[in-house]
Amino acid sequence: MEKFQSYLGLDRSHYFLYPLIFQEYIYVLAHDHGLNGSILLENAGYDNKSSLLIVKRLIIRMYQQNHLILSVNDSKQTPFWGHNKNFYSQVMSEVSSTIMEIPLSLRLISSLERKGVVKSDNLRSIHSIFSFLEDNFSHLNYVLDILIPYPAHLEILVQALRYWIKDASSLHLLRFFLYECHNRDSLITSNSKKACSSFSKRNHRLFCFLYTSYLCEYESGFLFLRNQSSHLRSTSSGALIERIYFYGKIEHLAEVFAGAFQANFWLFKDSFMHYVRYQGKSILASKGTFLLMNKWKYYFVNFWKSSFYLWSHPGGIYINQLSNHSLDFLGYRSSVRLKPSMVRGQMLENTFLIDNAIKKFDSLVPIMPLVGSLAKSKFCNALGHPIGKAIWTDLSDSDIIERFGRIYRKLSHYHSGSSKKKGLYRVKYILRLSCARTLARKHKSTVRAFLKRFGSQLLEEFFTEEEQVFPLTFPRVSSISRRLSRRRIWYLDIVCINDLVNHE
């Protein structure tokens, strides 16, 4: 991104982004850095040569229009989009998100260099969250389960960008584009939630950018108040700031919130507080009392109401005691348990035993939701009995085995941090027998006759990487190999969650 800074001249233009939408190279940049690929190349009927002509035609059409706002009120006749309204709309969605990401990406790079933060991809790993929880949650008492309210109005998403994008023309264009898409979706369905879901699917990159900016706006205020109310810096703030893209916002909030909350900081003093966000939800854990957590609960409700005009009922935030509560998120069921231990001591001629219980953060595989996901994907029925995958019978035998094996290896790889892996044996059984039933159905045979004919060696693809590596590493010490294969392993290369794991 640095090589585009001098070419775009953003420093000299004070982040005036609106003229960039008329430049052809911006569309090339959107194509090269697209998260979901380029709509220019995915659109049927357009090849690589004609895609540049489409861009030029779109730019010329935007130059010729001077009544963009009027087209919003007329849903049946929109001269700006023309006949290919949906296609041009998706092109503008990709380009708009790319343009608005440029100054924020440059701000992130400069902030990292100024703070001396070494950017690491390991911070993006999902498993890094669990390793952090293991180190910090075992000595905490209470946890807030927070459902982050969804912005009910598109204007809230636009307002979240005002502090970062100073170009009013770009914000007006974004506002016009959002209302144009929203009005079109509202004509299709009267349900606002379905209309918003339709918009997020068709404009995934732009929607993710706007939703992330909204979350960062909310978290910046919370992070400022949390750091001001504590004598010790939160150990999670480094990873939190690395995940979100805005730093200067904290300096602005210092001026806004200093007068409003200065007299109430003593209410929130807590040196042991940690925050984790995932899938539109968040967790706030603390060593404080129930009264302190209840104050934080109502702070969040009032903060969303005053800053984002969002009405959130206090019932959407739950206060739970960690010793009696399990956290179900990201495919794991985590809890703080007391691990009993016994210490044998001796004083002179007297020997005595001391019982000592140690708090330990434990993560397990919730097997029933995982079996439910397999049943939803037609690998088994609701009771967990394996069934064949009929739609895969047209594939070759090797492709069928490779698909089933890849699914199990990914599940085993993701759940390698579980302290008890017995639940994965049931998943392995379901997938192996489902694979055998699929192959038997393809060859018009029974499972017993098929396995007797080809042998069980046909399903060796179901061995995981750990099952293959450990016997090679310790070929003579089988007990060490089995013990290591049962140990918890967190991988820092997992940056996305599997659909079968995501039970939310």
UniProtKB/Swiss-Prot annotation:
Q: Where in the cell does this protein reside?
A: Plastid, Chloroplast
Function, as annotated? Usually encoded in the trnK tRNA gene intron. Probably assists in splicing its own and other chloroplast group II introns.
Which biological processes are named by the entry's GO terms? Answer: mRNA processing; RNA splicing; tRNA processing
The similarity comment for this entry is: Belongs to the intron maturase 2 family. MatK subfamily.
Q: Which Pfam families match?
A: Intron_maturas2 (PF01348), MatK_N (PF01824)
The reply on keyword rRNA-binding is: no
Q: Identify the keywords attached in UniProt to this record, alphabetized.
A: Chloroplast, mRNA processing, Plastid, RNA-binding, tRNA processing
Q: Please, which domain of life does this record's source organism belong to?
A: Eukaryota
Q: Look up and give the organism this protein is from.
A: Wollastonia biflora
Q: What is this protein called?
A: Maturase K
Per the record, the coiled-coil ranges are none
